From Swiss-Prot:
SUPFAM superfamilies: Defensin-like (SSF57392). One of its GO terms (biological process) is defense response to bacterium. The keyword Glycoprotein does not apply. Coiled coil: none annotated. This is Beta-defensin 103A. Exhibits antimicrobial activity against Gram-positive and Gram-negative bacteria. Residues 1-22 form the signal peptide. It comes from Gorilla gorilla gorilla (Western lowland gorilla). Belongs to the beta-defensin family.
Length: 67
């Protein structure tokens, strides 16, 4: 039973995001952007694209072609 407590603690520590980094959150946002048919743009979307969300907590935009 003691090993369960240790494993749970280690899992919890790996899943808690570090302030300012947000590794797991950024990964989920990128995945969600691709599921919606978008791409992650560094600065801004291209002229024929629209912003449909964010890819990271640092300001990358999720863009897809206008319909």
């Amino acid at each position: 039973m003691r090993i369960h407590y240790l494993l749970f603690t280690l899992l919890f520590l790996f899943l808690v995001p570090v302030p300012g980094h947000g590794g797991i959150i950024n990964t989920l946002q990128k995945y969600y952007c691709r599921v919606r048919g978008g791409r992650c743009a560094v600065l801004s979307c291209l002229p024929k694209e629209e912003q449909i969300g964010k890819c990271s907590t640092r300001g990358r935009k999720c863009c897809r072609r206008k319909k």
